[in-house]
Amino acid sequence: MAAMVNAADAPDAEVPYENQSSWTDRLEISVGLTEDLEPTISALTVQPLQQDADGRNTVFTQLSHFSYEQFDDRKNTTNLGLGFRNVSEDNSLLIGANIFYDYEWEEGHQRLGFGLEAKMDRLEFTLNFYDAISDEKAIDANVDELALDGYDVTLRTQLPYMPWATLGLQYYEWDSIDFDDIEGTKISLDMNLTENMDLELGLSDDNDSDSTIFANFTYNFGGNSSRPNMSDGYDTEAFVTGSDMRDHNLDKVRRQNKIITERDSSGVTISRKN
């Protein structure tokens, strides 16, 4: 996460802004598990392409690769993203837009993604749309597989007195071709364990399958010594206020990086959720 001079220290002057110089400072590795114990392993980085000296306008790229289990097969998907973020003059609000290209290597599925986001004290909002652009793929003589269109909307907020913990609530929908659309919700708790390590715990539930408990462990190589973490304990104030959103202009875009697919086997459609 970026380092900066607090706006409160220089209220009448243009505040200089600095970013970490090493690209590895914005590299993270994640391992995720669900109840079936099949791991999702990923690497993700966010890098600035162009940024104003005051840090209020940022063009960035987000690159990631995910390896995960789907239909009892190991899938690998690469995500290439381009985004723009703007921070308000008082540094209290960040708004952004992004576009992604997703490619799944095993079957050649392709997808475009479009996203909007807004961040302020105690609250984050993201809206993502997913548009599959590849044709149906023949897995074998009797099985076809198709990437699905969809969207998700997410709200995240800090928990009272715990600035190192964030509660997230997401609604998602995937457009099935032959059966009912997949509609579901996801609730999660994201905790900063240390300046480098995060733990996310959650529950996903939809009309396609049983509820699923999940956990994601993330290690960030750069870390951030100024961000609150669990060892700080509880805060004396319910919510942190006065945050400078320029600290978040190189946060990762939160989206579904896996390509969700549907299989048709001898007339029976099988779907896979988040």
Where are these regions (language model features)?
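Outer-membrane beta-barrel initiation region
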Residues: 5-73, 248-254, 258-274
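Transmembrane beta-strands of outer-membrane beta-barrel pores
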Residues: 31-37, 63-71, 84-86, 101-105, ...
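Residues on the lipid-exposed face of transmembrane beta-strands in outer-membrane beta-barrel proteins
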Residues: 43-47, 80-84, 99, 114-120, ...
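Short beta-alpha junctions and helix-cap segments that line functional grooves
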Residues: 110-114, 201-203
